[in-house]
Amino acid sequence: NRDKHITIFGSSKQGKTCLRKHCLNENDYILVQCSNRWSLSDLNANILKRAGYELTESTNVTYEGKAKVSASVKILDATLGGEAGGGATKNVTHRQLELDLSDVNDIIGALNEARFHQYIVLEDFHYLKSEVQKDFAIELKAFHESSELCFIIVGVWLDENKLVIYNGDLTGRIVPVNADLWNEDELREVIQKGEDFLNIRFKESFTSEAIKASSGNVYIVQETCHRACNESGIHKTVVGERRLVGDGLNARSLVAEIIQEQSGRYNAFITNYASGFQETALAMHKWLLYPILTSSIEELSKGLTYRSIRSKITSGHPQGKNLNPGNITQALKAVSSLQLSKSIQPIILDYDESNLTLHIVDKGFLIWLSMQDRNELLSTVGLPEMT
């Protein structure tokens, strides 16, 4: 649907990129892999580069005093009736432009000049700084109204209205695609496709346990099956009779093994997140971990509402009910930027400003948390233990 931009969102390792690759041919799009170090101008520059432009710094400056860039692109012009034989010939013409990379009108003009018509995929959009995401949401409206260009934005979050919050003018101009939800039948279908490809069959009890232990994470299901195949000596398609796999293997133990390999990353997340951007009297980022580390896995799976977060924090924080709710809101809105500043990748938390809900967007973290001594984790970051 080129009439609207598209967002593909969901938790980490839930198949967002696979979905995009499945639906688009390589020639249908250009891919821009986002970086947490980019400004809006950097993002726009990378879009132009992937579209075929060569960029060099100009001697002229923008009205803000920043250097403009010279952009050049080669364009193939097909003409009919060559001198010999009357067949089609191709002439290469060069376009030379001077651009302000922070001006969306210049970017649209450059892409139109290059006769660019592919989809533009922005992968890992959540890695961009919050202010860059917000600024680009403003640009998206201009792309929608002043061009036929279509963006496909892929990121780790669970709020289908994330970009609309950044720019209300995008209402009705974005198609959100939720790639987070995998039900049991869909996970079974994933396993079955692998079984058919390898000419094997997993034992039913193994399949059921793998799905149950995965918390709905398709990567964990696939990795569990992969390790079961390795332990059974299956590294390629079985020739002849279909082979049974999983007999004598414990799917839950394999899942625990996969999660345990991430233990260092999850422990580092807790300690690094607790330290916040800097030391403050209220230590709000540390206290934001309190409702996470004291809630049940079921509660965390559904997401923690602002009301429940506030209730849990005020029940344990030294200032109690005198704590200003604005401090909690401010900490919640900084969830993503704090993780990026601490190089926590992939991110583990995301705050849904539409529904005022804090989500765990790394399902592996939920499984890991279910295996931990919560009081030990609380003690590690100086929070009161559960009674």
For each feature predicted by the language model, list its residue ranges.
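P-loop NTPase nucleotide-binding core
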Residues: 2-121, 127-134, 148-149, 323
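An amphipathic alpha-helix signature
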Residues: 41-48, 184-188, 192, 207, ...
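Residues immediately C-terminal
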Residues: 127-130, 142, 159
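Substrate-engagement module of ASCE P-loop NTPases
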Residues: 139-150, 331-338
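Short regulatory helix/loop adjacent to the ATP-binding pocket of P-loop NTPases
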Residues: 159-174
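Conserved small helical "lid"/interfacial subdomain of P-loop NTPases
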Residues: 179-207, 215, 219-224
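Amphipathic alpha-helical "lid/sensor" segments that cap RecA-like P-loop NTPase cores
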Residues: 203-261
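C-terminal leucine-rich, beta-strand-based interaction scaffolds used for sensing/assembly
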Residues: 246-387
